[in-house]
Design a protein with these regions (language model features):
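Residue-level detector of intrinsically disordered terminal segments
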Residues: 17-19, 27
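Short, low-complexity intrinsically disordered segments enriched in A/P/G/S/L with frequent Arg
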Residues: 10, 14-15
Length: 153
């Protein structure tokens, strides 16, 4: 036989035993926890209203017909967009998925969890509302154009 096995070892002969250090075990635990978190919550971000919309009056004030008045004010003075909307506290986290953390070129779909994570960091540590936007192009000019269209000056 020539194989040295401790007495009482019930594993089948030829079974693989993995020995990991605590750092590797920790990484595996974070990986499993991250998959569970993302699956259970379908990502890490959501849009939540700052104002109640529980009654008909609430709805009429937050949406139509009441919303027309701030629209008119912004139409008359474009700078009022910062007074009447969240625009002054919004940023876009834009990626084409080609240089994602230590993952490299993983594409826009696979980049979304990282961009959501960055959005969470903006909110938690800076109080800034951030939206992840993953573009399906690697053309620099197209990316610039898309960002300009998203946020006109």
């Amino acid at each position: 036989m020539g194989k040295c096995r401790p007495s009482g070892d019930r594993r089948p002969q030829g079974s693989l035993v993995m020995i990991m250090n605590s750092q590797e075990e920790s990484a595996m635990n974070f990986n499993e926890a991250a998959l569970k978190l993302h699956e259970e919550h379908h990502g890490k971000i959501e849009v939540v209203s700052k104002v109640p919309v529980k009654t008909r009056d609430d709805l009429s004030t937050a949406y139509t017909p009441g919303v027309a008045e701030p629209c008119r004010k912004i139409h008359d003075n474009k700078k009022d967009v910062y007074k009447y909307t969240a625009k002054g506290n919004l940023v876009a986290v834009v990626s084409d998925g080609t240089a994602v953390l230590g993952l490299g070129n993983i594409g826009p779909e696979a980049a979304m969890p990282v961009m959501e994570g960055k959005s969470v960091l903006f909110k938690e540590f800076g109080g800034v509302d951030a939206f992840p936007i993953c573009l399906d192009t690697t053309d620099t000019e197209e990316i610039i154009k898309a960002v300009k269209y998203i946020a006109p000056c």
